[in-house]
Design a protein with these regions (language model features):
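C-terminal transmembrane-helix exit sites in multi-pass transporters
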Residues: 50, 96-121, 246-265
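Specific alpha-helical transmembrane segments that line the substrate/conduction pathway
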Residues: 33-36, 40, 78-108, 234-253
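C-terminal-most transmembrane helix of multi-pass membrane proteins
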Residues: 132, 238, 242-287
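Hydrophobic alpha-helical transmembrane segments of multi-pass integral membrane proteins
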Residues: 1-6, 31-48, 119-122, 147, ...
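Specific transmembrane alpha-helical segments of multi-pass solute transporters/efflux pumps
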Residues: 13-16, 53-88, 129, 216-232
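Helix-helix packing/entry segments at the starts of transmembrane helices
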Residues: 90-95, 163-182, 218-254
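Transmembrane alpha-helical segments that form core, pore/gating elements
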Residues: 7, 11-23, 46, 100-101, ...
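Juxtamembrane helix-loop boundary signature in multi-pass membrane transporters
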Residues: 1-9, 101-154, 164, 269-287
């Protein structure tokens, strides 16, 4: 029951996490800087909490790749939900099972099989339906935010496959690698942005407090979700985590006035179905 509660909590928070980042942007703090600070807070807490374990834990290049891929995943996701329509971005992110099937085949040697093929077909059909434009042209993401959401899902899938490959590392070690990776990727990406650093007037106590709070939430959320995944069957976990889309749809409607059209609902349903079938690809959740 505790594991299920953890996953439901994780789904709810991930479905709402876009909102404080939008609030921060409206206060004058861009997505790159806000992501940097919030994940730096999570990293700082993690280094203190797991310092003793980290000092004796084995190192490997795989942790570096996990850091890089997870770093882009989280930065791209934040930028996407700030700039774009929340549900369209999240559904493009939820094409991750499609990429997971392909990466697992390439990196882990897993057979695609009938279920894997069904996941691929449903994902592609859902994306094509949602992105179709009557005016013509290829069904591709319409703007930078949607491309960011798509790339975040792709990197999320790759980081998960890499995490499965790095099974000798603890949850704490992989979590710290993720927080470190996000911090570094934000610094590199932000270095090329003229407006990366907000003005001093934007960094009011309330703004700093909100960023610190989000950082604490990200730290706790990572551990809660990892615990839930470790103690819940894959089929059940994927269904619970899909509640994120429900929470996000409700929040986007009431907090941002965003609503999906019939074609987007149809495409989204196929993407959700692909995610549900993806839970049958493995008996044990990654991580």
């Amino acid at each position: 029951m505790l594991a299920v509660s953890g996953l439901v909590t994780g789904a709810m928070v991930w479905g709402l996490i876009w909102y404080p980042y939008r609030v921060l942007q409206q206060a004058g703090v861009g997505g790159e800087f806000a992501t940097l600070v919030t994940y730096a807070v999570a990293l700082g807490i993690g280094l203190v909490a797991f310092g003793r374990e980290l000092r004796v834990a084995p190192r490997s290049w795989m942790l570096g790749w996990i850091a890089i891929t997870a770093g882009w995943t989280n930065l791209a996701y934040v930028l996407a939900v700030i700039e774009g329509e929340v549900m369209r971005v999240m559904l493009l992110f939820y094409l991750a099972p499609l990429w997971t099937v392909l990466f697992a085949r390439a990196l882990l040697g897993e057979r695609v099989g009938k279920v894997g093929a069904l996941v691929v077909l449903l994902s592609l059909a859902g994306a094509a339906t949602m992105l179709y434009e009557p005016a013509g042209g290829l069904p591709l993401p319409a703007n930078r935010a949607e491309w960011m959401g798509l790339s975040a899902g792709l990197m999320f899938a790759l980081s998960n496959v890499l995490a499965r490959k790095a099974h000798e590392h603890s949850v704490a070690m992989k979590s710290v690698a993720i927080w470190f990776g996000v911090t570094v990727v934000c610094l590199i990406y932000g270095a090329g942005q003229a407006d990366f650093l907000p003005g001093a007037q934007a960094l009011a106590p309330a703004v700093l407090g909100l960023m610190a709070l989000v950082g604490v939430v990200l730290f706790a959320l990572s551990l809660i979700v990892q615990y839930g995944l470790a103690h819940t069957a894959a089929n059940q976990a994927i269904v619970i985590m899909l509640l994120e889309l429900v929470f996000a749809a409700i929040a986007a409607y009431y907090l941002a006035g965003e609503a999906m059209h019939a074609r987007e609902w149809a495409g989204g349903a196929m993407i959700v179905a692909a995610s549900l079938f993806s839970g049958k690809l493995t008996e044990h959740p990654p991580g």
